[in-house]
Amino acid sequence: MAVRELPGAWNFRDVADTATALRPGRLFRSSELSRLDDAGRATLRRLGITDVADLRSSREVARRGPGRVPDGIDVHLLPFPDLADDDADDSAPHETAFKRLLTNDGSNGESGESSQSINDAATRYMTDEYRQFPTRNGAQRALHRVVTLLAAGRPVLTHCFAGKDRTGFVVALVLEAVGLDRDVIVADYLRSNDSVPQLRARISEMIQQRFDTELAPEVVTFTKARLSDGVLGVRAEYLAAARQTIDETYGSLGGYLRDAGISQATVNRMRGVLLG
């Protein structure tokens, strides 16, 4: 029976649940593992996961804590973006979009007076974020490591904070590299929308904890209103924006993989492992 819950995390799944051409038990995805409890750790052991690819930035790890995984599981810190050589903000993509919503002064007609205008602005911001994904420092390194681990036959769980944006990007490229149809790739990606309520609750909690005293009711209302589905959910056009950047900058996914140092032989081995 497929395991569909990871206690202490959310947005968890075996990618093979949706991408049924994949062998089960090879590629998993989830939110952060910083609150994994004993039952969650037991689940990881039962699933036979050997490696965790943590795509969070160093600041996210410091702020939220490392993954609480069992001994014997290798954790690969693959910050995306990697600020060791990049001056960009190291917030999670949805956090960056959320900050833009909070600080927007309405000068561009995006004052957020209605829920629809907030969601429209959020969608634009998230699309902009995804458009930059392929060229962000750390993106190709993260993809290279995940592909290499999978090609070596090691069951991998990939995660970021929410398990939807950076994780969604990396998983989508893995699935495309092994030859899965676009509709299957998008179907797995969109499943993260089922976890929006948990993400909204977690972010609301984080916002509250950043203040020494309880927020004024009007501030809470203003803030929560900007936790729109455009920021917290995923859309097919977000993934398409990232994919367009790959084609425009590298010519094709193959070109992107080669630039990342991923050989065709490695891709072939990964395909053999994942498809059987």
Curated annotation (Swiss-Prot):
The record marks 164 as: Important for substrate specificity. Pfam families: Y_phosphatase3. It is found in: Secreted; Host cytoplasm; Host cell membrane. Changing residue 160 to S: Shows less than 1% of wild-type activity. Does not affect macrophage apoptosis. Its main location: secreted. The active site is at 160 (phosphocysteine intermediate). Residues 232-250 are annotated as: UIM-like region. Disruption phenotype: Disruption of the gene impairs the ability of the mutant strain to survive in activated murine macrophages and in guinea pigs, but not in resting murine macrophages. Infection of guinea pigs with the mutant strain results in a 70-fold reduction in the bacillary load of spleens in infected animals. Disruption of the gene has no significant effect on the morphology and growth of the mutant in defined liquid culture medium. The important role played by PtpB in virulence and the lack of PtpB human orthologs make it a highly promising target for the treatment of tuberculosis infections. Several classes of potent inhibitors have been developed and studied to date. Drug candidates include, among others, (oxalylamino-methylene)-thiophene sulfonamide (OMTS), isoxazole-based compounds, highly substituted indolo[2,3-a]quinolizidines, benzofuran salicylic acid derivatives, chalcone derivatives and several 2-oxo-1,2-dihydrobenzo[cd]indole-6-sulfonamide and piperazinyl-thiophenyl-ethyl-oxalamide derivatives. Essential virulence factor that promotes mycobacterial survival within host macrophages. Acts as a phosphatase that possesses triple substrate specificity toward phosphotyrosine, phosphoserine/threonine and phosphoinositides. Supports mycobacteria survival during infection by modulating the normal host signaling pathways, attenuating the bactericidal immune responses and promoting the host cell survival. Belongs to the protein-tyrosine phosphatase family. This is Triple specificity protein phosphatase PtpB. It comes from Mycobacterium tuberculosis (strain ATCC 25618 / H37Rv). The lineage of its organism: Bacteria, Bacillati, Actinomycetota, Actinomycetes, Mycobacteriales. The gene is ptpB.
